[in-house]
Amino acid sequence: ENGERLMKMIECQTVSSREIYDDTEFAKLRAAVKELFPLLHERAEIKYFSEDCWVYKIPGRDESRNILLMSHHDVVAATGDWTHEKFGEISDGKIWGRGTVDTKTSLFAELSAVEELLAEDFEPACNLYIASGHNEEIFGDGIHEAVKYFEKQGIEFEFAIDEGGGVISAPIDGIDCKCAMIPVHEKCYHIKNVRAVQG
């Protein structure tokens, strides 16, 4: 059942591009998410930033505290040859398609968990925010606009959870076990000037 539900999000071809923003597929995704997660849309406060960055807020018992779940719903272009449908196919018990790994699956998991908790009348101990960007793949401004809003409102987070790396075997020499790769910041870059002095 969850596989079929996730497929409704994968089928939306939300490809981010620097050249043009086409809302058609992003609108399909918004409609699919609203259909898949009705309690979230009934109970959360929802704000949109830039063209299509979403922020949901589920109020908690202690409104002075906040946590943030992050993701993004844009994908890179599905170029090249694919053995399965580029935007969604279930085959041999596996879900195939652009966005299954990066990263509609994690967004689906976050939204599903919250939907299930809301169905049990769960009230979080603190405010729960879910933010999803629409142009992360091209270093776009979507989530930055949401951050500006948080700063202006004085909203600070006790922690934020974003997409992570995979669980991989032996990531470097000398480590012979499976390791979960945990990133410590959002996609960005750092410029460092290094000067070496002999002696």
Predicted regions and their residues:
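Acidic/His- and Gly-rich active-site-bordering loop/insert found
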Residues: E1-T100, L117-P124
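Active-site-adjacent bridging/hinge elements
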Residues: E85-F87, H190-N193
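Short beta-strand segments
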Residues: M70-H72, S132, I161-E163, V194-A196
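Polar, glycine-rich mid-to-C-terminal structural blocks
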Residues: C179, I191-G199
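Short strand-loop junctions, especially beta-strand C-caps/beta-turns
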Residues: Q13-V15, G133-N135, A196-Q198
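Short Gly/Pro-enriched turn/cap motifs at secondary-structure boundaries
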Residues: E45-K47, M181-E186
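Acidic/histidine-rich catalytic neighborhood of metal-dependent amide-processing enzymes
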Residues: V101-M181
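Short coil/turn connectors at secondary-structure junctions
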Residues: D62-I67, S91-D92, P124-L128, Q153-E158, ...
